[in-house]
Amino acid sequence: MSRRTLMLLSVATVAVSASAFAFGGWASISIEDLPDHFIVGKATQLSFVVKQHGVTPLDDLSPTIEARAADGSGNVQATATRGRAKGQYLATFTIPRAGDWRVRVKSGFGPSDITLPPMPAVAANSVAPVLTDYEHGRRLFAAKGCVNCHVHGAVDSKPLVESGPNLTEKKFDAAYLALWLANPAIRPPTKANQVMPNQGLSPREIGALVAFVNNGKVAATK
């Protein structure tokens, strides 16, 4: 995939359309330090940031988290509290039994929610399943807010603003995509309000997202 294609992608990503403003806008949710799995009976704290239109941190919301067993056998709910940073919230919950669980984060800002792909909960004395870069990236695609503007067939989520291209069949130069995810400003937007936010991704998160988008090809990270 050429750099020109990546430039066009960056212009489209997280584009704030006039219709979005007309209907009161939307908010992105970005989960910080997503765990690889849950431990049964042990409290998990999720920290996340809510930003209007993916840009402006939103304080004084009342976000909630719901974790549902993938087999429908149970659910856990938690109310988030304010964190130290602007727009940051913390929610603590405990998964009661082993199995796959889906976590939904409700921002408290209209219908701006995200639902993560199923994540395993394991007993404290059990060996956790191996997490591949691809699967890690698939979860991050939702957790870091990529789903706000992009469709990907491997992630069951509808974009809040359909401004970005469908990434299901896309592949990009891995090294350049890694640089771009680390610093979206290397491709400044050509139009106002069409900004790819910098999510402060770690090298591991960048490598996982590259592996997911490119269907397994991992970029070298330093």
PLM features: residue spans?
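Beta-strand-rich structural segments
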Residues: 42-56, 91
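Residue-level recognition of secondary-structure-to-loop junctions
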Residues: 83, 89-97
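Extracytoplasmic electron-transfer domains, predominantly the class I c-type cytochrome c fold
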Residues: 157-219
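N-terminal signal peptide c-region/cleavage motif recognized by signal peptidases
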Residues: 15-19
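Electrostatic cytochrome c docking/interface patches
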Residues: 122-142
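Short pre-active-site segment immediately N-terminal to redox-active cysteine/selenocysteine motifs
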Residues: 142-148, 153, 205
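Short flexible loop/turn segments that cap and initiate beta-strands
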Residues: 52-78, 161
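Proline/serine/threonine-rich low-complexity linkers at boundaries of modular beta-sandwich domains
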Residues: 20-28
